[in-house]
UniProtKB/Swiss-Prot annotation:
Belongs to the MetA family. The gene is metAA. GO terms for cellular component: cytoplasm. GO terms for molecular function: homoserine O-acetyltransferase activity; homoserine O-succinyltransferase activity. Gene3D superfamilies: 3.40.50.880. It catalyses: L-homoserine + acetyl-CoA = O-acetyl-L-homoserine + CoA. GO terms for biological process: L-methionine biosynthetic process from homoserine via O-succinyl-L-homoserine and cystathionine. The record marks 192 as: Important for substrate specificity. This is Homoserine O-acetyltransferase. Its EC number is 2.3.1.31. Transfers an acetyl group from acetyl-CoA to L-homoserine, forming acetyl-L-homoserine. Substrate binds at residues 163, 192, 249. Its main location: cytoplasm.
Amino acid sequence: MPIKIPDSLPAKEVLTNENIFVMDEHRALHQDVRPLRIAILNLMPTKITTETQLLRLIGNTPIQVEIELLHPKTHVSKNTPEEHLTKFYKTFDEVKDEKFDGLIITGAPVEQMEFEEVNYWEELKKIMDWSVHNVYSTFHICWGAQAALYHHYGIKKYPLKEKMFGIFPHRICKPNTMLLRGFDDCFYAPHSRHTEVRREDIEKVGEIDILSDSEEAGVYIMKTRGGRQVFVTGHSEYDQFTLKEEYERDLAKGLKIKMPKNYFPDDDPTKPPVVNWRGHANLLFSNWLNYYVYQETPFDLNELK
C-alpha cells in the first residue's frame, strides 16, 4: 500500500531506496480516496528501526494508508531522541477521541517483568480498552500479544527455561483462514522472547482460534472469531540482521545467551543470515490489511462500534 508518512521521517529514505511506494503528503491530499487510518503503538526501544520494519510491510499495495505513530506518555524512552518523538509521534491523549481502521501494538523487551510492574501498564490497559470500540482490527506483536491476551482474557504468560531465539518452522493449524491465505504448509518466522503463552489456556477461552504453531516455538498466530483482534507471538517484521544485533548486544552485556537457532549459515556468526521469512511476513500483513481491515471496516469511521 502506498503509505502516507511525513516527508522527513527517517524511514522514508530507507523505504524509497528499497522501491517501497511511499507517498508524500502533497500527493496524498490530491487523491480522491479515503486512506486506511492505521495507528502504530511503538513500545520497542529502537523505535526508528521498528517503525521502518513495520512501514516496509504495510507499504506497496494499491490502497493508500495513513500512519499515526504513537508512544506511551508514561514511559521515558532512553534509545530514541526526544526530538524524533516530538516531531513524529503522538500520545494516546492526543488521539483518544479519534477512530482508526487498524492498530498495531508492538512488542517490548519487558516480558520477564510482571505486567503490572511495567511502568506504562495502566496507560496500555486504557489503550487496549479504547481499541475495542475505536479500532476495527488490532494486530498485537510478541509481548504486545501476551499483554492483550492477559488483559482481555486473563491468559497468563510463563517463563521459559531459556530464551526462544532464532528462526523456527511453523505449520498451519486452521486451513482456509484468510489471514494465512497463500501461506505454504511449512513457513518460517523469527522469535525472540523469554516467555510463552500455552495452547491449553487459550483453548479454554473459546473465543480465540489458533491459526498457526511451531513444534519448538509453540503457539504463533491467533485471532478472535471475528478477526477484530490478531495475536502474533513472534517477530515476522524483523529484518535480516535484527537477531544478530540482539545476539551481539546480549554478548556485550555479558549475558548468557545461546546463538539464535537456524539463523547463521552453519551456525557461523561471521556469515550473513539468509532471510527465509520475508515472503510470509509480507503475506501476513497484507492479508490482515486486506481481509480484516480494508474489506470489513466501515467507510465512515464514525460508524465503528
